[in-house]
């Protein structure tokens, strides 16, 4: 019963540990979800505040086709149709900005540049506006060079920002997948460990129950056997006392010897069987606990390996991204964009470092708890081994006592033989020679301690006195 209570305590402790680990996993999931930050909205706010140049304007749209060719290849390489379209668009922008109401219908809405140009030819004012814009196209090209370059640099920055934002979104998705995979792996490992523990514990408890029932049955059988043996010895002694007067003791002595030998053989056989059963039970218990410990160690190692690999992959992705950012951003934008990018990078690094530290801390705590529980189970197993060894010592002590009892039976058998021989010698009249021979036989055939020799001597003296008294009485009466 003591061993069963100990294993029930171990099972309760395991259930408590499983509940704590489930709580830790849920806490890690909440922590990972809190790390999700909408960097796309943050980048849009920063761009809207820092770069108002992105606001759309009529002049910028009018020069969208003309400026790239003029700045890259020179004004002379720009085709005439592109120049004409740029001049017409600038004229329309100028008229719209002046608030002119009677603009040519061909230049309103969806503009057809050929029709709009022919409509401007009909009015000197409009044609003057167009001609002035066409003549100032070379200076317009150089005047808008710096804003255009800034716009191109800003466009490059926005592209980099979009790439960074997409990378952040992908990183968040990967972290969420990693969290889900980690949680699923932990739950699967916990289910496997719980199933293995329950199976091993159930087998151990059943085996211990069977062993205890077997021991109890054997002890009960031994008690009944000893009781029967005691009753048999008592019956034999009564039969010996009844048969002394009839001088018929040889058959009873032989029967007693046969019963004693058969009982001794049966006890030896039962003791050997019980010893073999106990040893096999101990070996089975050791095998079950070794298997459980190996499986638990493999599961913990697999979880730890998967966590380390995921962290290394995350660090590699961050390192690759940092290298890409350093090599792609132009030196012109370093002074303007470095504070914002550095702040965002530090925020992400802190979030990832905090998440990694939290994972490592909780995983280490879980591993320590598993190791402590395994140590407690090992100590319980050692206590069980010591109790089984104590039972084995008790069985050996009982075996020695049974051996002493059998030796006493053999001594009593030899003593009865000697009494019988002595009585027959006295009756038949062989006299002192027979008495001396009988004493020599007893001296060299019985090997007991001094207390038993004293008891046998006194019994012999009383028996001789009784016989001599009976003979003397017969002679006096004669």
Swiss-Prot record:
Its main location: endoplasmic reticulum. InterPro entries: Nuclear_fusion_Kar5. Residues 1-19 form the signal peptide. Disulfide bonds: none annotated. GO terms for cellular component: endoplasmic reticulum membrane; nuclear membrane. It is a multi-pass membrane protein. Residues 20-419, 478 are lumenal. The keyword Membrane applies. Belongs to the KAR5 family. Required for nuclear membrane fusion during karyogamy. This is Nuclear fusion protein KAR5. It comes from Eremothecium gossypii (strain ATCC 10895 / CBS 109.51 / FGSC 9923 / NRRL Y-1056) (Yeast).
């Amino acid at each position: 019963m003591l061993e069963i209570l100990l294993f029930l305590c171990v099972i309760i402790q395991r259930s408590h540990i499983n509940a704590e680990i489930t709580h830790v996993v849920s806490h890690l999931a909440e922590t990972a979800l809190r790390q999700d930050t909408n960097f796309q909205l943050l980048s849009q706010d920063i761009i809207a505040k820092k770069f108002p140049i992105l606001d759309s304007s009529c002049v910028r749209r009018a020069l969208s086709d003309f400026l790239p060719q003029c700045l890259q290849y020179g004004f002379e390489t720009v085709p005439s149709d592109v120049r004409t379209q740029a001049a017409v668009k600038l004229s329309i922008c100028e008229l719209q900005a002046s608030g002119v109401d009677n603009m040519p219908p061909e230049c309103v809405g969806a503009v057809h540049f050929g029709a709009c140009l022919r409509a401007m030819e009909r009015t000197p004012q409009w044609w003057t506006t167009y001609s002035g814009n066409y003549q100032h196209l070379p200076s317009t090209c150089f005047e808008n060079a710096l804003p255009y370059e800034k716009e191109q640099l800003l466009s490059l920055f926005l592209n980099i920002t979009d790439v960074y934002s997409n990378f952040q979104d992908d990183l968040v998705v990967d972290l969420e997948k990693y969290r889900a995979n980690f949680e699923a792996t932990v739950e699967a490992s916990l289910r496997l460990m719980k199933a293995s523990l329950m199976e091993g514990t159930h087998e151990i408890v059943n085996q211990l129950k069977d062993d205890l029932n077997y021991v109890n049955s054997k002890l009960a059988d031994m008690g009944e056997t000893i009781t029967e043996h005691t009753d048999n010895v008592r019956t034999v002694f009564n039969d010996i006392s009844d048969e002394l007067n009839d001088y018929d003791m040889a058959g009873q002595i032989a029967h007693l010897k046969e019963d004693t030998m058969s009982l001794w053989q049966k006890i030896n056989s039962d003791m050997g069987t019980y010893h073999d059963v106990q040893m096999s039970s101990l070996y089975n218990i050791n095998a079950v606990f070794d298997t459980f410990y190996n499986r638990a160690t493999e599961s913990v190692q697999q979880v730890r390996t998967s966590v380390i690999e995921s962290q290394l992959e995350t660090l590699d992705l961050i390192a690759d991204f940092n290298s890409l950012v350093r090599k792609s951003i132009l030196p012109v934008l370093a002074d303007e964009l470095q504070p914002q990018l550095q702040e965002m990078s530090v925020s992400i690094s802190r979030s990832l470092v905090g998440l990694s530290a939290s994972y490592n801390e909780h995983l280490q705590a879980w591993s320590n708890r598993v190791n402590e529980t395994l140590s407690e189970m090992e100590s319980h197993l050692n206590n069980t081994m010591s109790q089984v060894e104590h039972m084995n010592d008790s069985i050996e002590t009982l075996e020695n006592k049974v051996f002493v009892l059998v030796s006493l039976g053999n001594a009593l058998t030899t003593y009865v033989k000697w009494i019988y021989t002595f009585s027959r010698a006295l009756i038949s009249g062989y006299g002192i020679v027979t008495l001396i021979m009988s004493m020599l036989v007893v001296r060299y055939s019985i090997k007991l301690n001094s207390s038993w020799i004293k008891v046998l001597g006194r019994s012999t003296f009383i028996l001789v006195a009784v016989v001599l008294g009976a003979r003397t009485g017969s002679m006096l009466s004669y």
